[in-house]
């Protein structure tokens, strides 16, 4: 059951990331690309969680989980918020940080093998420098950017910023309860992804009347109706 919940959370985050990517391709708004990358990292972290619970954790699944969930998700959220506020220098900074994070996740040695089905704790497998320190700094600065920009513009975009702040709070709670197991963590991941997605759309002035899944169903129904009429 825990693996199914984690897998479902991964699929949801992946679907929402894909929708944001499609919107970026249509509008070329840079914050949409950064937010899409953040939700994609969130989806990969949830997929690694499902892998670890279903098949047992190993070094590879832990590295993916730590890279995507511990090193990338929050910093990329911050990059998106900075881009939304017009700070274009955030884009190259985001690329530079992503490269650093990937290098750390691939290269740093583990202090102990990763085994079992419970969510591994970083302090049991990674030295403080550089992996854990970079994660702390990246998450702190990324979250700070999101919160400061959301609060400073909340009068202009109350709904969007409120949803983003709620999503950040839910994501932080999910990280805090990781010790309780994969099921509650997966639920928090799914809830945070949905809140963040809605907040991103409201903040960027996108239409949010239909969910991505409902839009797809509507397009399929229209194509089917068109085919029947032609016949």
Q: Where in the sequence are the language-model features?
A:
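C-terminal transmembrane-bundle signature of multipass membrane proteins
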Residues: 147-231
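A cytosolic-side transmembrane-helix exit/cap motif
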Residues: 54-56, 82-88, 112-120, 184, ...
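Alpha-helical transmembrane segments of multipass membrane proteins
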Residues: 20-21, 46-50, 172-176, 197
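Juxtamembrane "helix-exit" motif on the non-cytosolic side of transmembrane helices
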Residues: 49-57, 110-115, 175-180
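Membrane-proximal helix-loop-helix units in multi-pass membrane proteins
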Residues: 75, 85-144
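Short helix-adjacent coil turns
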Residues: 27-31, 154-157
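Alpha-helical transmembrane segments in multipass membrane proteins, preferentially the mid-helix core
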Residues: 15-21, 76-83, 133-157
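Individual alpha-helical transmembrane segments in multi-pass integral membrane proteins
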Residues: 1-13, 29-104, 185-194
């Amino acid at each position: 059951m825990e693996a199914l919940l984690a897998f479902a959370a991964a699929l949801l985050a992946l679907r929402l990331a894909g929708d944001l990517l499609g919107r970026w391709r249509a509008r070329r708004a840079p914050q949409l690309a950064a937010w899409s990358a953040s939700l994609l990292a969130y989806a990969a972290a949830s997929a690694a969680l499902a892998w670890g619970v279903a098949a047992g954790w190993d070094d590879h699944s832990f590295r993916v989980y730590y890279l995507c969930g511990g090193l990338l998700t929050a910093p990329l959220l911050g990059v998106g918020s900075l881009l939304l506020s017009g700070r274009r220098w955030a884009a190259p900074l985001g690329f530079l940080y992503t490269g650093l994070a990937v290098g750390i996740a691939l290269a740093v040695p583990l202090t102990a093998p990763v085994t079992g089905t419970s969510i591994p704790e970083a302090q049991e497998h990674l030295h403080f420098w550089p992996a854990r320190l970079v994660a702390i700094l990246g998450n702190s600065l990324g979250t700070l950017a999101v919160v400061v920009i959301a609060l400073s513009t909340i009068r202009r975009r109350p709904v969007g910023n409120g949803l983003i702040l709620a999503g950040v709070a839910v994501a932080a709670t999910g990280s805090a309860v990781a010790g309780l197991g994969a099921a509650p963590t997966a639920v928090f991941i799914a809830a945070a992804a949905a809140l963040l997605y809605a907040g991103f759309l409201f903040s960027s002035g996108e239409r949010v009347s239909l969910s991505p899944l409902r839009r797809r169903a509507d397009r399929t129904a229209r194509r089917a109706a068109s085919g029947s009429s032609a016949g």
